[in-house]
Amino acid sequence: MQNRKKILTTCAFPYANGSLHIGHILEHIQADIWVRFNRMIGNEIYFICADDSHGTPIMIKAKKNKISPEKMVFLFYKEHKNDLSKFNISYDNYYLTHSKENYRFCKLIYKLLKRKKLIFSKYISQFYDCKINMFLSDRLIQGKCPECNSEKQYSDNCNICGANYCSTDVINPISILSKSVPIIKKSKHLFFDLPKFEKFLKKWIHSGVLKKENLRKVSEWFKNGLKPWDISRDAPYFGFKIPNEKEKYFYVWLDAPIGYLSTFKNLCDKKEKIFFSEFWDVNSKSEIYQFIGKDVIYFHSLFWPAILHGINLKKPTKLFVHGHVTLNGEKMSKSNGFVIKAKTYLKYCDSDFLRYYFSMKISSCAKDIDFSLSDFMNKVNSNIINKIVNLASRSSSFIDKYFEGYLSYKIENYELYCKFTSLKEKINKYFQSNNISFIIYEIIKLAELANQYFNKKSPWKLTEESKDKRNKLHEISSMGINMFYIIMIYLKPILPNLSKKTEDFLNISLKWENINKPLLYPHLINKFKPLCNRITKSQINYIKRESTIK
């Protein structure tokens, strides 16, 4: 067994102003697979997330729905937590940023940064809506991105190219609230002095924390020099008030990443023998891994590590960056309803199936992943049902009928068995590097090999009463069970539902350290029951109908 690591893993926080869709779920599945594997090999790992619970969109939606922002945030928090649990996302703590702990951390960090002269104030030009007499924060303005010219972008950052810019730089601005053209008015804001961290950040991003493709993107932001970061917003705003400032609030992108600290502290307070300093102390030997989408890499690779460095806390060990999920080749959009909600999917399909389909496409690169319902159905039925589960069904039918559930005394084809077990280190590396699609490729090759073996041996021809044939039948069927057993050990972090049913069926836990130990007599398996069902066209049609997808 390797040296036991201490690891903290986080996902970027879902925003508490709407239901989750399958695009959101990708990141949580990706991280959960990585976490489950690390638990499986014996690492001490904690997995946390929270709802991002502040900001203008929440304030606006709550007002529109005639509900308080606090109540709306809590309702979505409960919904998100429930959806994620049904996808078997195994968080040790799922919290929200609108919490006492997070406000305490925000005030403390602000105080520390200010003491180090890393916070300064200055008057800025800001959009102001004369029709409703209020300053307009970033999410209340839409216009054309000044970097890539994409239309309908918010005035703080672009969802298309990822650029972060001054709100008044947006082209052809329009107020979302009144649909009028805003004027520019002066307002005092507070800034975090990001340029002071340029030397540190250049070194940090080259420390192995980012993949080369992400590194190239982040490096571009240094070309024109880093700019101070506006960490304040004018009232009205739903968030935390800034101490000793009138009508000023912490910008959501300041308090949201601080939520990584407060959510973990909340876990430490609830559980014994988990110590905050063991993970966040600057000299800690623990490791911190963060799973994020490519659209928030700017905040996680520049602002957040700079703040951690400014307050002398540990920086992330690695950022795993993923792409977006497209639907039939098109970008999903909440505004026009072109999404598959998490709860709609769960109503009709096993959560394992989405975990599997995404796993076929997850790699360490930040490429977009396309979701096609027809391809989803075909791949799940072909690979999980026909190739993997069917292997268990075919093998167990003979074990149950002729041998009362007992497996044979020996492995029928030891060379083939070793082909299955010899992939252990390769698959270990793929899990650790987050190249899950490579694992699926290897596993499907194994499943095909197992079924070819079974077909070639034709055990159904060996059911006669002769002792030699019965022994051979026993060994071949037990070989099929052992190949299925190894496949399912490899798949355990990916398919928790199927793994639990497999453990019940095989009468043994699926443990990484047992891969090289075959199941032999007197091991007894239980009578086979269907482990999962095929996806039908009617299920797909129901999802399409409820998601208004053609």
Curated annotation (Swiss-Prot):
Keyword tRNA processing attached: no
UniProt-listed Enzyme Commission number(s): 6.1.1.10
Binding positions (ATP): K334
BP GO terms, sorted: methionyl-tRNA aminoacylation
Pfam families noted in UniProt: tRNA-synt_1g
Binding-site positions, Zn(2+): C145, C148, C158, C161
Top enzyme class: ligase
Location relative to the cell: Cytoplasm
Known cofactor(s): Zn(2+)
Chief location: cytoplasm
Motif ('KMSKS' region): 331-335
Cofactor details (free text): Binds 1 zinc ion per subunit.
Motif ('HIGH' region): 14-24
S-S bridge residues: none
Cited Gene3D superfamilies: HUPs, Isoleucyl-tRNA Synthetase, Domain 1, Methionyl-tRNA synthetase, Zn-domain
SUPFAM superfamilies with a match to the protein in the record: Anticodon-binding domain of a subclass of class I aminoacyl-tRNA synthetases, Methionyl-tRNA synthetase (MetRS), Zn-domain, Nucleotidylyl transferase
MF annotations from Gene Ontology: ATP binding; metal ion binding; methionine-tRNA ligase activity
Alphabetically ordered keywords of this record: Aminoacyl-tRNA synthetase, ATP-binding, Cytoplasm, Ligase, Metal-binding, Nucleotide-binding, Protein biosynthesis, Zinc
Keyword Protein transport: no
Catalytic activity line of the entry: tRNA(Met) + L-methionine + ATP = L-methionyl-tRNA(Met) + AMP + diphosphate
Family per record: Belongs to the class-I aminoacyl-tRNA synthetase family. MetG type 1 subfamily.
Annotated function: Is required not only for elongation of protein synthesis but also for the initiation of all mRNA translation through initiator tRNA(fMet) aminoacylation.
HAMAP family per UniProt: Met_tRNA_synth_type1
Subunit structure, interactors included: Monomer.
Protein name (Swiss-Prot/TrEMBL): Methionine--tRNA ligase
